[in-house]
Structures are given as C-alpha cells and as structure tokens.
Amino acid sequence: MRIAILSFDGFNELDSFVALSLLNRVPGWHAMICAPDATVTSMNGVMISAGIRLDTLPDMDAVIVGSGVRTRQLAADAALMARLRLDPSRQLIGAQCSGALLLTTLGLLETVPVCTDATSRPWVEAAGVRVIEAPFHASANIATAGGCMAAHYLAAWMIARGAGEAQARTVIDYVAPVGEKEATVERIMSVVSPFLRA
C-alpha cells in the first residue's frame, strides 16, 4: 500500500506525522509526505523534504489530506486544487481537521457528514457541507477526523480497511501508553469499527 500524506506549507505536525508514523508500522506499507515542492515547512517551522510530489497522487492507494494554517488560501487556489487528482472509487481518502475544506472544494464531501476541528468548522460549513460534532466519520472510501488528537482514528481506519482490523489493533497497541494499552485500543477501535461494517 502506497499512501500520500498531503502536506502544505504551514501544515500541522500532529496531523501529518502521527498518520505517517502509524501507517508505516504496517508491514509492506509505505506512507510518504506529499507536497507541491521539494521541501515543506510546518506551522511551527519544521522544514522537511517531501518524499513525493503532487503528480504522484493518482498512483497512490490512499491519501490523507492534512490540515494547516493556510488551508483557506489553498482552497481558493484553483490552479492548485486542479492538481489534487483523487479518486475515491479506488483510493482510500482521509482528511484531518481543515483538510476537510480541501475535500469539500474538490466536491468529495457533498453528501456525507463531515468531521473537522472547531476552528475550521465555520469555513467547512460555509462551503456547503454538514459538519457533525464527532471525532471521526467514514462513508465508503472517504473519512474525516476532527481535532489534532483524532489523527489516530484516521490512521486506524485506514489500516483496518487496508490490512484488517487485527493489524489496526496491533499498531495501536504498540504505540499506546504503557498501562493503558488495552483501554486505548478498545477506545480507538470502538470509534472506528462501526464504519468498517457499514
């Protein structure tokens, strides 16, 4: 499984790096930071090299659209949005927080409930979609998560969809706090599991 973690200048480190780390713990999976340019700088000044560029998006098996401080400007950039070629008929697609605004702009969230963070909610609602007060929601191959600490829900859903629920539990168990492993796995999977059976 090849996965793009779509990150733009001003990206939120939690959204991009938590997903990157969790997804790469699945044997045979390769999650990479995807950006428009060779380097991308986070909202807190962390500069990293992009593993892949936007032109590779159609070749990915899955894509996570992260959030950041410039999302509204990105959504208004028609030329950039035209470069984001996603196909929910064959790709697993997830959006974290304000990343939902980009999926909305692409017309991918028109008929499904959407999760996003409190700051992004007015922008996403203004774009014409229904935002719900929940950390995670998925419909078919598209999922959204709201709140930086909801990144693990998005990753767990993607792992469960692509490699099975047992693998998702294994990955979450590995990174869960000591003394809280069982409770953490059960909490995360209780949120994600209903959307695996829908």
Model-derived regions: residue spans:
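Small/polar loops that bind or transfer phosphate-bearing groups
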Residues: 7, 116, 146
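Structural detector of well-ordered beta-strand residues that form the stable sheet scaffold
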Residues: 93-94, 115, 132, 143
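Extended, subdomain-level signal for the structured scaffold at the beginning of enzyme domains
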Residues: 1-93, 100-105, 122-123, 127-133, ...
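Conserved beta-strand segments that form the floor/walls of ligand-binding pockets within enzyme
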Residues: 64, 115, 137
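Positions that flank functional sites
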Residues: 38-39, 118, 139
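Amphipathic alpha-helical segments enriched in hydrophobic/aromatic residues interleaved with Lys/Arg
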Residues: 133-144, 148
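Short hydrophobic/aromatic-enriched beta-strand-loop microsegments
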Residues: 110-118, 131-134
